[in-house]
């Protein structure tokens, strides 16, 4: 049976803090970072004790969620410098330190990738931290993908696979996702068998709440809200300084009481490409997240992290207001062509006309 997310376990809190103290930040001398617990990111005059992630309510779920969540791309892609001019994925030890540091600042939402890219790393990290019941775990299950048979058994299979990867007997949120051919003709909108499958998974105690969303257009989101908004609890929508069509979509989501989870604040790094993030462009990731959080119709901004420095930078957006100068910088950034063919779906569908 799913356990209530608000349960606080002092023993687990101690375990997490001790892990950070004994394992995580002892690595600073080996090239890690300044301890997150001891030195807040120097962008505000607030006291360190006040530098914690704020919370919002995730729509009709009623869940109290951190307004910044850790995205699934954190573990699935090679983004960590390997010291030899290339990149690699974070190790389990690195992931454990990052998740522990985030939780100590109040983060309680961990998202997943689309099913074909899922990783076992965050599940192993939570096991080491004994922290499963202190976070909200969201998985993404392929409702319909090219080459994947669309039926209830596939949804059961994807879900069981995700439960094993996360080393848990339940997840808090299960989102139906599609990664290509998101059209009315593709069959994505035949949700009858999907809803039946989700209902069964709920009855079995394997999922608590449901949602949907991925790469389809704002127009199709609006249609989905109208058709399925009464059933689902949440939606996942791309939103960033360049791709702002979500601002036309979010009111409809809230009208249905849906919790809103935004993705792609950096367009998977495209907005940060070739930027001097330790010099003239310092604070840019923070400001990109701050922009998203200014929209009070957003409940969670999920973002990828690949190093503990990025954890510290991203979370600081929760207690750092976007300055006029920062806003001007973002507006200039939004005018540049990102030049990423992989994200043509964002360019074509999510920019204001």
Which residue ranges define each predicted feature?
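Active-site mouth loops of central-metabolism enzymes
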Residues: 75-92, 141-153, 278-279
